[in-house]
């Protein structure tokens, strides 16, 4: 009788022609750094292990950390293609880099913006190529975040938005402007593509804005500490898409649970390693969204957050 562990190994080996001496290779192109994305990657690895895949035993996972540098994702994607990995797992602009590097190696998106609108897949139900995984609807999220910001800071009139337009689609920038206008907020979108751009933008904000919206992606995530430090020093309330910004000292965040997304990416990877084709795996969307509020940051900013808003929070940092 086969144990469950040996059965899992047998199934995975069968998918690759009984190559027991040469386990499949997963190329994990991490758009961020170990500091910004480490917990998410750990969730992926843990879920993959639960599904029967142990790194170094019946699978080999090659990690590459781009630390928010787009040029690095391009380089690493090319390396994985040359290495002939069996699956590439990535997120954000890493998905684009991987797609540009190969049309044949399966690509699993752990988190990406609107994959249909941005042309990566034909539809969520039938991706129509080598990309599948998790996709987010950022336009809707931008509107929701600004509504939350208005609930917390009713008198907000001027908004600065840090946006890396090199990786953020035009419709997402339009969504920020449109939602702001609907709420009678004047939005100033600041284009940032490097850490130096972030420093320059933050240096101009003191006294010039009522709040700061940070479009959360690998570049801003890699520089979250300097963003939060500068904003707090200038007494500027902040809103983000990742909870990690709030645990680092930011005011509020609203967005998907990325631990959950990366764990679900492992499930896509498992299916592909067992023989499924990306086009047969419909893309999925987040099911868990979290509102995180940092009361300590609110007090330092002199803000009083209503009980009504606090009751909506999934987590309140005292």
Please state what every model-predicted region is:
Residues 1-318:
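Short hydrophobic alpha-helices and adjacent helix-cap/hinge residues
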């Amino acid at each position: 009788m086969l144990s469950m562990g040996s059965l899992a190994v047998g199934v995975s080996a069968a998918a690759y022609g009984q190559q027991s001496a040469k386990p499949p290779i997963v190329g994990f192109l991490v758009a961020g750094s170990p500091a910004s994305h480490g917990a998410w990657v750990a969730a992926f690895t843990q879920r993959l292990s639960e599904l029967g895949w142990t790194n170094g035993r019946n699978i080999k996972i090659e990690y590459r950390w781009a630390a928010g540098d787009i040029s690095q994702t391009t380089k690493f994607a090319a390396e994985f293609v040359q290495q002939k990995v069996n699956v590439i797992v990535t997120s954000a602009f890493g998905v684009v880099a991987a797609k540009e590097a190969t049309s044949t190696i399966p690509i699993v998106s752990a988190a990406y913006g609107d994959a249909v609108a941005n042309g990566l897949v034909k539809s969520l139900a039938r991706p129509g190529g080598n990309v599948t995984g998790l996709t987010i609807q950022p336009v809707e999220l931008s509107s929701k975040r600004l509504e939350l910001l208005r609930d917390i800071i009713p008198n907000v009139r001027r908004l600065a938005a840090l946006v890396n337009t090199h990786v953020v689609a035009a419709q997402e920038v339009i969504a920020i402007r449109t939602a702001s206008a609907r709420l009678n907020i004047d939005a100033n979108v600041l284009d940032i593509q490097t850490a130096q751009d972030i420093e320059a933008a933050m240096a101009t904000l003191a006294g010039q804005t009522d709040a700061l919206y940070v479009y959360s992606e690998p570049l801003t995530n890699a520089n979250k500490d300097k963003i939060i430090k500068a904003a707090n020093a200038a007494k500027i309330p902040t809103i983000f898409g990742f909870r990690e910004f709030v645990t680092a000292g930011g005011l509020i965040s609203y967005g998907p649970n990325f631990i959950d997304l990366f764990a679900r990416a492992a499930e896509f990877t498992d299916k592909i390693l067992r023989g499924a084709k990306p086009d047969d795996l419909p893309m999925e969307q987040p099911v868990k969204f979290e509102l995180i509020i940092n009361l300590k940051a609110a007090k330092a900013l002199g803000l009083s957050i209503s009980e009504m808003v606090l009751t909506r929070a999934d987590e309140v940092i005292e």
